Design a protein with these regions (language model features):
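Extended alpha-helical interface modules used as scaffolds for assembling large macromolecular complexes
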Residues: 1-135, 140, 144-146, 157, ...
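Short catalytic/binding micro-motifs of nucleotide second-messenger systems
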Residues: 148-151
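Conserved RecA-like P-loop NTPase helicase motor core
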Residues: 153-155
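Extended hydrophobic secondary-structure segments that form protein cores and membrane-embedded regions
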Residues: 159-164
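Short, internal active-site loops enriched in acidic
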Residues: 165-169
Length: 187
C-alpha cells in the first residue's frame, strides 16, 4: 500500500491509502479471502474455476463453484455471530474472490434507478449481479430497475444474475440468470 493523501484535521493525521498496482491488489484480496473463508488450500482451485466460468459465459459452472465455495467455509466462522444473516457477508466473499482474479469489478455500481450490487466487466461480456438474503427475487430487481441499460452501448454480451442466500443454509438457494438480447441500442 502507498499513501495517497495525508489529511491533518488538528485532532490527528489521517491517511488515504491506495493500491500501487494490480499485483498488490490481487495479493491483498487473497489475504481477505483467507480471513473471510479459511480456504487457503482450495483458494486457487476456486479462483481458476470462477475465472474459467466467466470467460466462457458458463453461469452453471459459476453457480456450482460458488455453492462449493460457500459449502467449504468452516461452520465455526458463523459461531457466536449473526454474519450469515447479512447480504454484505456473502457479497464480500464473492467480491474478494473476483478481485483476486485481477478482473474489473464494480461494487455498488450506480445507475439512474439504483445501485447494482456487483458488476463484472470482461473484454467480451458484462455481468450484472444482485444479491439477496431470503426469498426476494434478485433477478427481477435487475430487470425492473433496468440496470442493463447502462451498458447497452458497450457492444458486449450482458448477463443478469440474481443470487439468493439462505442464512440457515449459509449458501446459495436460488441462482437465476438471463442474457440481455442485443437487439436494441441506445443512441
Amino acid at each position: 500500500l502507498t499513501i495517497n493523501e495525508v489529511i491533518d484535521d488538528e485532532r490527528r493525521l489521517k491517511f488515504s491509502l491506495k493500491l500501487p498496482n494490480k499485483e498488490v491488489k490481487i495479493s491483498l484480496n487473497d489475504l481477505f479471502i483467507d480471513y473471510l473463508t479459511n480456504q487457503t488450500l482450495d483458494k486457487i482451485k476456486f479462483q481458476d474455476n470462477l475465472y474459467d466460468a466467466l470467460t466462457k459465459n458458463d453461469l452453471e459452472s459459476f453457480k456450482s463453484t460458488l455453492i462449493t465455495l460457500f459449502s467449504s467455509i468452516p461452520y465455526n466462522n458463523y459461531v457466536n455471530n449473526n454474519i450469515a444473516h447479512f447480504e454484505g457477508y456473502y457479497s464480500s466473499v464473492i467480491y474478494a474472490y473476483l478481485a483476486s482474479l485481477g478482473i474489473t469489478i464494480i461494487a455498488e455500481d450506480i445507475t439512474n434507478k439504483g445501485r447494482i450490487d456487483l458488476t463484472i466487466q470482461l473484454d467480451h461480456a458484462i455481468y450484472i449481479i444482485e444479491f439477496k438474503v431470503g426469498n426476494e427475487n434478485a433477478l427481477m430487481q435487475i430487470i425492473h430497475k433496468n440496470y442493463a441499460s447502462k451498458y447497452l452501448n458497450d457492444n458486449k454480451a450482458i448477463y443478469l444474475v440474481g443470487i439468493n442466500f439462505d442464512s440457515a443454509e449459509r449458501n446459495i438457494t436460488n441462482f437465476n440468470y438471463k442474457q440481455v438480447k442485443m437487439t436494441t441500442r441506445l443512441v
